[in-house]
């Protein structure tokens, strides 16, 4: 299966954003909170339930913590889960929802390769999923069906799980799969059967679950042991794209387009053009580039607000760049920094409306910036 490189689409010149901030929205540094000395690798707001839009979670070491953003610019600690294995190091988290009673679920995983599902309503560990043969680098939740999650692993596979029944439904690996660690995954926002993955083999792959969707349906009504479920292997993606020349450590859909980044100080927006009748064939067209200075180390992930208006990404010097995602050429809204923040920002979290931006630091600190003219920042 041929890899598609850049410039095989329409051949248009990619629009590159300027690093001069437009100051369309201005932010001020607010609270900070240091959890400990172990790095924070992930942070995320709960977009799965409108009741909890101001709630976010972090993972660092063997600890998963939830907080509420207060209007005065500080945080309120809500819950903390400490894994029984003191050597566990969580790398990723994702919010999900129980499809029966609507309870907020927090899913986390890391170096042990075990997925932990925490029920935040009962404050208990609800389930643990075992199956991956190595550490898990990212988990994402299906926004249209928030009881489905997908996990990307060092074992070169991606797995689809039902958090309600505990079933591993599909495994994406094999002949057309990744050839090194899978670092990031993301579900298509409106096509429930499609997702993208990327990793250390320098590729982004687009997968379709269309032919296997009956197994997804079956996973909800399965009454036997989860281990007896007829889990299926999916070996071939519908598209393999070589947009980058190094590790690809973060990918997100923007409508039918894809945002992805490597270790070369930029995020790329591109259009995949797949041919449903000919898996693996198609073309890609690079549309835009969002420069991010000093972003040349791997495992730095970006995030967006709920409506994908703003994108925030940290760098190895502790700065955060906030881009207006959908303008062309891209517009840099703001460059955020705090004199005290000197270590890499591994992941950001942008609030529902973009008025609060959080950074998870490698020094174990959560950093917060609030929009200056927003009602919540006037106290």
From Swiss-Prot:
GO terms for biological process: heterochromatin formation; negative regulation of transcription by RNA polymerase II. Keywords: Chromatin regulator, Nucleus, Repeat, Repressor, Transcription, Transcription regulation, WD repeat. It holds the Pfam family WD40. Its main location: nucleus. Polycomb group (PcG) protein. PcG proteins act by forming multiprotein complexes, which are required to maintain the transcriptionally repressive state of homeotic genes throughout development. PcG proteins are not required to initiate repression, but to maintain it during later stages of development. They probably act via the methylation of histones, rendering chromatin heritably changed in its expressibility. Belongs to the WD repeat ESC family. This is Polycomb group protein FIE2. The lineage of its organism: Eukaryota, Viridiplantae, Streptophyta, Embryophyta, Tracheophyta. The gene is FIE2.
């Amino acid at each position: 299966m041929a890899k598609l490189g850049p410039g095989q689409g329409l051949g248009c010149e990619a629009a590159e954003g300027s690093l001069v901030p437009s100051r369309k929205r201005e932010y001020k540094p607010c609270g900070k909170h240091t959890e400990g000395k172990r790095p924070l690798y992930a942070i995320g707001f709960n977009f799965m339930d409108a009741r909890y839009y101001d709630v976010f979670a972090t993972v660092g070491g063997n600890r998963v913590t939830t907080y509420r953003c207060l209007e005065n610019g500080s945080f309120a600690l809500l819950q903390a889960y400490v894994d029984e294995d003191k050597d566990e190091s969580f790398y990723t988290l994702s919010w999900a929802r129980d499809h029966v009673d609507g309870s907020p679920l927090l899913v986390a995983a890391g170096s042990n390769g075990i997925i932990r599902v925490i029920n935040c309503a009962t404050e208990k560990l609800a389930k643990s999923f075992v199956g991956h043969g190595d550490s898990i680098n990212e988990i994402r939740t299906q926004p249209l069906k928030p009881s489905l999650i997908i996990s990307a692993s060092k074992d070169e596979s991606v797995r689809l799980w039902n958090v309600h029944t505990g079933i591993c439904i599909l495994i994406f690996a094999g002949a057309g799969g990744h050839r090194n660690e899978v670092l990031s995954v993301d579900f298509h926002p409106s096509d429930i059967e499609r997702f993208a993955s990327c990793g250390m083999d320098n590729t982004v792959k687009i997968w379709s679950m269309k032919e296997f969707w009956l197994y997804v349906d079956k996973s909800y009504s399965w009454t036997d042991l989860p281990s007896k479920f007829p889990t299926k292997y999916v070996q071939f993606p519908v598209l393999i794209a070589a947009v980058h020349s190094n590790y690809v450590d973060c990918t997100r859909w923007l409508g039918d387009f894809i945002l992805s980044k490597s270790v070369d100080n930029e995020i790329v927006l591109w259009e995949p053009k797949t041919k449903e009748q000919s898996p693996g064939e198609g073309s890609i067209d690079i549309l835009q580039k969002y420069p991010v200075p000093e972003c040349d180390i791997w495992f730095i992930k970006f995030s967006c607000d709920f409506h994908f208006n703003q994108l925030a990404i940290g760098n190895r010097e502790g700065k955060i760049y906030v881009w207006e995602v959908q303008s062309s050429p891209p517009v840099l809204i703001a460059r955020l920094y705090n004199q005290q923040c000197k270590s890499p920002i591994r992941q950001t979290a942008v609030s529902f409306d973009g008025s609060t931006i959080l950074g998870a630091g490698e020094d174990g600190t959560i950093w917060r910036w609030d929009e200056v003219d927003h009602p919540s920042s006037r106290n």
